[in-house]
Amino acid sequence: MFDKKAARLRRAKKTRAHIRHLGVHRLVVNRTPRHIYAQIISPTGGEVLAQASTLDASLRSGATGNVDAAAAVGKLIAERGTSAGITKVAFDRSGFKYHGRVKALADAARENGLEF
């Protein structure tokens, strides 16, 4: 039987293989209990084109492990992505449930110009 982390990593691996087959930019989300991170990665997978996290100087002053902070990261990654000329991405939630902080980040990114 799988433990929780192994099951999450298995889901993430399947999702990444599917996105790689599509050949589009990928918005990757990683979360820890204290912070949330987002990166836009090139279709080849070898280059990070934009990144944002609660460790950024503009977001570090507030709370970093809640839904509001995740929404702020979503807004920031959308702004940085559109300034880099990226509007269409595939959402890679890294095996995490589409709920809570992951959902808040995705919704904020959509509202600020990224298309999933």
From Swiss-Prot:
This is one of the proteins that bind and probably mediate the attachment of the 5S RNA into the large ribosomal subunit, where it forms part of the central protuberance. One of its GO terms (molecular function) is 5S rRNA binding. HAMAP family: Ribosomal_uL18_B. SUPFAM superfamilies: Translational machinery components (SSF53137). Keywords: Ribonucleoprotein, Ribosomal protein, RNA-binding, rRNA-binding. One of its GO terms (cellular component) is cytosolic large ribosomal subunit. The keyword Ribonucleoprotein applies. GO terms for biological process: translation. InterPro entries: Ribosomal_uL18_bac-type (IPR004389), Ribosomal_uL18_bac/euk (IPR005484). It comes from Psychrobacter sp. (strain PRwf-1). This is Large ribosomal subunit protein uL18. The keyword rRNA-binding applies. Belongs to the universal ribosomal protein uL18 family. PANTHER family: 39S RIBOSOMAL PROTEIN L18, MITOCHONDRIAL, LARGE RIBOSOMAL SUBUNIT PROTEIN UL18M. Part of the 50S ribosomal subunit; part of the 5S rRNA/L5/L18/L25 subcomplex. Contacts the 5S and 23S rRNAs.
